[in-house]
Regions:
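Acidic/His-enriched low-complexity segments
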Residues: 1-245, 368-370, 385-387
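Long, contiguous hydrophobic alpha-helical segments, chiefly transmembrane helices and signal peptides
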Residues: 33, 51, 125, 136-139, ...
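Hydrophobic alpha-helical and helix-loop surface patches within well-folded domains
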Residues: 37, 181, 210-455
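Repeat-unit-sized solenoid/scaffold elements
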Residues: 60, 125, 180, 379-381, ...
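Long, His/Glu/Asp-enriched segments that create or flank divalent metal/ion-associated functional microenvironments
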Residues: 437-483
């Protein structure tokens, strides 16, 4: 048995899933999905196949001919959930699992009408990162494995289902509607995502539109109207955009994150609707994930910095292009303070403040912090400072192109670095970033005239004329400086 991801029952000696066909009926009354998942394997196989599940009620497992396959659901483990072991007959390449989800499924949030902007209809959305896809679909829930999928969602006719995939049609059948989606690019399971509610859309550009409840649609469209320019800037920096569309979904207020980088349909908190586009750095971050995270993916949560450190670096490069180096420096300064707070938070668990972590027996949600984001960013900034921006830009494009649609470990990144930028890791003291707690001595620090102005105001009450044009980032830095 070879389990390379501490947060999955996946056994690397068993066949990988190649495609998923998923059908689900959304039941708002019972807060369940009644579903079936057809897994097509990369090769025909025999013997045990271990899948990740969490609180799924498995009803049957059959092969492509409809013949039952023996299966066993193990007792639940607090972090991993339950292992679904299916015994495959010789030559089995496809299996279908019929099941229903729990009302407490960890990936699903069911909202009452009162929790929505319109107040008339319920709402459902999914959040599968880091290891919650298993509460919706029985599969190999590890980013080491990428799948293509087709999906059919049956929902109340008055509602709209959207997915982080390509739209393939809608059919109304009595009081219900069947929505079809296809994801042609292979994705890690945590990027499966959908939402169901009273939704409307407005086009933003040739490759993007925004979805939202009708009550907030116009505000969302105005706030995010520059997304196409952002997309073009990102392509100049990181190469062609591989996901065809970059649509946005403005979520209800209970969405627990600033944003989630679901491919083709980024989920965003409505708190970004400031009215002046001052908080669109979150959109830049989620867009950057289209290359760093979605295209090149951490092999497990132990290498999360490969997703987030690269993405913060990419986000700030996009901000530089669109809004200038001063704005990027403001965000870097905020990030540095967030990193210092995270390191203090984990003072009793300092190993969690290194980039390369051992998370065996640790829930990735409990280990979540700004460390992989901001310390990872500092590591890449340190490398850029040594080799220079043109050389690092070339390296970054080569890194992305060489690992498209692949999962990567820290060790593989190190090997790639040594091959293409030999000797640089020693110059930046990579050990201090990757394996040592805390902030390395000499880590890059943001500098700009606006940062110096804010620093000079520490402990002072600013004059109205001095701050009349301040952005939220400047106010946040000033207020945090009062601590």
């Amino acid at each position: 048995m070879a389990r390379l991801d501490p947060h999955s029952y996946n056994d690397d000696t068993q066949p990988e899933t190649e495609t998923l066909t998923w059908k689900a009926r959304v039941d708002f009354r019972t807060r369940r999905l009644h579903a079936e998942a057809t897994l097509t394997l990369k090769e025909a196989s025999a013997g045990p196949l271990d899948l990740d599940t969490r609180e799924l009620e498995i009803r049957s497992v059959v092969d492509a001919e409809g013949k039952p396959l023996p299966f066993l659901v193990s007792p639940p483990e607090p972090i991993l959930g339950s292992r679904l072991r299916v015994e495959l007959r010789p030559g089995t390449k496809q299996l279908t699992i019929r099941y229903r989800t729990s009302p407490q499924a960890s990936a699903l949030q069911w909202l009452t009408p009162a929790q929505t902007a319109g107040g008339q209809y319920p709402y459902l959305f999914s959040q599968c990162q880091a290891i919650h896809a298993r509460s919706v679909v029985p599969l190999q829930d590890t980013p080491r494995i990428r799948i293509r999928y087709r999906a059919e969602l049956t929902v109340p006719k008055e509602l709209k289902a959207v997915m982080a995939a390509g739209f393939a049609g809608r059919e109304e059948q009595g009081v219900e509607a069947l929505e079809r989606y296809e994801m042609p690019q292979p994705i890690p399971p945590y990027l499966m995502a959908f939402a169901v509610g009273r939704l409307a859309a407005k086009e933003l550009g040739p490759r993007s539109r925004v979805w939202a409840e009708p009550e907030v649609l116009e505000a969302a469209a105005e706030e995010f109207e520059d997304v196409d320019a952002m997309l073009r800037a990102a392509e100049e920096l990181f190469g062609a955009y591989d996901w065809e569309r970059f649509d946005l979904l403005t979520m209800p207020p209970s969405f627990p994150y600033g944003g989630m980088e679901n491919p083709r349909l980024t989920f965003l908190t409505p708190s970004l609707l400031a009215g002046d586009k001052s908080l669109v750095s979150v959109v830049a971050h989620e867009l950057a994930h289209s290359w760093t995270g979605n295209l090149v993916t951490n092999a497990s949560a132990e290498h999360f910095w490969l997703n987030e450190g690269f993405t913060v670096f990419a986000e700030r490069r996009i901000l530089e292009v669109l809004y200038g180096t001063e704005v990027a420096a403001l965000h870097a300064a905020l990030g540095r303070r967030a990193l210092e707070d995270a390191i203090h938070h984990f003072k009793d668990h300092p190993r969690l403040t290194a980039l390369r972590t051992n998370l065996t027996g640790v829930d990735p949600d409990e280990a979540f912090s700004q460390v992989p984001y901001e310390k990872g960013y500092l590591f890449l900034r340190a490398i850029e400072d040594v080799v220079g921006r043109p050389a690092f830009d070339g390296f970054l494009k080569r890194y992305i192109e060489s690992h498209r649609f692949q999962a990567l470990t820290t060790e593989q990144f190190i090997a790639f670095m040594e091959k293409h930028l030999p000797g640089v890791l020693a110059k930046v003291d990579a050990e201090a970033y990757l394996n040592t707690p805390g902030i390395p001595l000499g880590a890059p620090a943001p500098r700009s005239e606006r940062l110096e102005q804010i620093s000079r105001m520490k402990g002072k009450v600013p004059r109205a004329e001095d701050v009349k044009d301040w952005t939220p980032a400047e106010w946040q830095l000033y207020i945090e400086g009062l601590r």
